Structures are given as C-alpha cells and as structure tokens.
C-alpha cells in the first residue's frame, strides 16, 4: 500500500511525462545534449557512491576523450568506461520487444566489472557475503540462482507503475546480492532499464544523497518499501526537470508560485501547500515550484 505522498508524486510524474510526450519529437540537438548530460551524471554518481575517486570533470575526460588522470587508480578509469558501455547496453535492451531476463542482469554485471574482476564478471557468487553497515543478511550462495530466476519471473516486467517496478527491481536485486562485487551499480542500471523500457527517463541517484539512499534501502528490508519508492520517484523527477529546462516551449508555459499569487487571492505559502498536495498541476525545478499558467487560471475559476 503506497502512502498518499508517494501516490501524489507518481501522479505528478505521469502528468509531467505526458507534457513532455506532447512536445515530441524533440530536436536532435536537445536529445543529444540531454543524453550526454545523463550519461555523465549517471556514471559519475553511481561510481562515486561506491567509492570511485574521479571527479565529475575527470569522469567527463575519461568518457569523452579517453584521458586517464595522473595519480588516480586505473580501476577508477575502467569503472567509468565500463559504466558508459553498460548504459549503452541498457539503452539497446530497452528498445528490444522482449522481457527483461535473468541473463540480461548478468550481462549488465559483466560489463560493469569488465577487465576489473574477470573471474566474477557476470557470474553469481559462490561464497556467502554480508552488506557493510546493514543488518540484512543476503541468502546463501547455494540458492542465489534460484532466487534470481524467481526475481526475474515475478518482479521484472510487472504491471506495477514503472517507478514502483523499478524501485522493487533495485531493492530485490541488492537484497539477493547475487554478485561478489558490483551489486549496487548493477541494481541502479537495472532500475533504469525498467524505467527506460517503459517509456520513462533514467533516475540518477546522487552521490550527495548517498546516506539517505542507504537509509531508505535499509528501512525497506524491514518492510518499509514506500520510502524507497518515493526516493526513486524524486530522483526520476529531477531528470524530468532537466527535460523541462531544456525544452523552451514547456518552460515558457509555466510560472512561479509568486507570479501565480499575483493572478489570484492565494498567498505563496498557500500555493506551496497546494503544490505539495498535488492539488494544482505544479512541478519542482531545483527548489522552486512552477505551475502551468493555463491550468492554474482554470483552478482559480473552478474554486471561486
């Protein structure tokens, strides 16, 4: 059972997606720029969460120019290149009209660890493991394959809302922890494969949100999955906002709550409450709520 604030977030995401879809096809230059930005941010943040020491600019040099940075481990450079290749594989899988399979997950993992740990790349663990800082104990190595088969069959390709399916896919994969290393990066790639395959955008979990990310994941192990679904949804909403910023026709149809207040008898504080409740069609751009001017004026008229 999802909480009201998660349901409102999902509704907001659906409305935002419909708005972007209504402005398709987007120009090739906008799509190219957005993709380049997403690949960089996704790669940098996902690797940084796992301890990679490359800065975002060093990651950009590695991805775009193949330049290694002095005094940084070769492993960090390989992780950046591997992650970019894994994203390209995920994009390819998302365009194929077949279900996401257990084999696909192993293929993604194989790309993540390529030339870093060839013995375990794409191979399920044959030892028992613990997750650092977590009370959760992953299943015995002997049952990993069976667990993964059941996971692919029951959780992936479900009829849940795409954000819910993506969050559950991520959570269940890290719960099984099927690999010796690379579980987190593989889980985030799988999460976004689910989203992209179902017509959404990748959700980038930021390095700066690492502690919150681990906290909501840990709570999920005790049955409180709603917080993690909300966390994934907010990460996706951040990507949607990047699309809004990049599409002038969309951006020009929205006004700030301060501007909306001048068109009505509502205060900015009250409009902020309405926006958070989902009562008015608003979205958050960075720290500011924006509302559709046309839809807001209709709301005012309907509630006079």
Annotate each predicted stretch with a short phrase.
Residues 1-181, 185-304:
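FIC/Doc superfamily catalytic core
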């Amino acid at each position: 059972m999802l909480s009201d604030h998660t349901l409102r977030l999902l509704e907001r995401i659906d409305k935002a997606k419909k708005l972007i879809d209504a402005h398709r096809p987007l120009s090739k230059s906008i799509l190219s720029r957005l993709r380049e930005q997403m690949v960089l941010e996704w790669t940098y943040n996902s690797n940084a969460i796992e301890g990679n020491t490359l800065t975002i600019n060093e990651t950009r040099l590695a991805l775009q120019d193949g330049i290694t940075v002095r005094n940084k481990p070769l492993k960090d450079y390989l992780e950046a290149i591997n992650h970019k290749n894994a994203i390209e594989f995920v994009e390819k899988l998302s365009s194929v009209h077949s279900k996401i399979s257990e084999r696909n997950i192993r293929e993604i993992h194989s790309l993540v660890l390529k030339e870093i740990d060839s013995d375990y790349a794409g191979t399920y663990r044959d030892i028992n493991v613990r997750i650092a800082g977590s009370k959760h104990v992953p299943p015995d190595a002997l049952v990993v394959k069976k667990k993964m088969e059941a996971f692919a069959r029951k959780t992936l390709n479900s009829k849940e809302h795409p954000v819910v399916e993506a969050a559950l896919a991520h959570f269940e994969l890290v719960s099984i922890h099927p690999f010796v290393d690379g579980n987190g990066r593989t889980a985030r790639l799988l999460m976004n494969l689910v989203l992209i395959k179902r017509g959404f955008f990748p959700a980038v979990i930021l390095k700066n949100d690492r502690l919150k990310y681990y906290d909501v994941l840990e709570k999920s192990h005790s049955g409180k999955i709603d917080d993690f679904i909300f966390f994934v949804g907010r990460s996706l909403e951040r990507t949607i906002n990047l699309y809004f910023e990049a599409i002038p026709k969309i951006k020009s149809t929205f006004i700030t709550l301060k501007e909306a207040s001048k068109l009505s008898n509502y205060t900015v504080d009250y409009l902020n409450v309405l926006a958070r409740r989902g009562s008015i069609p608003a979205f958050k751009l960075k720290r500011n709520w924006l509302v559709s001017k046309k839809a807001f004026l209709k709301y005012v008229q309907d509630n006079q």
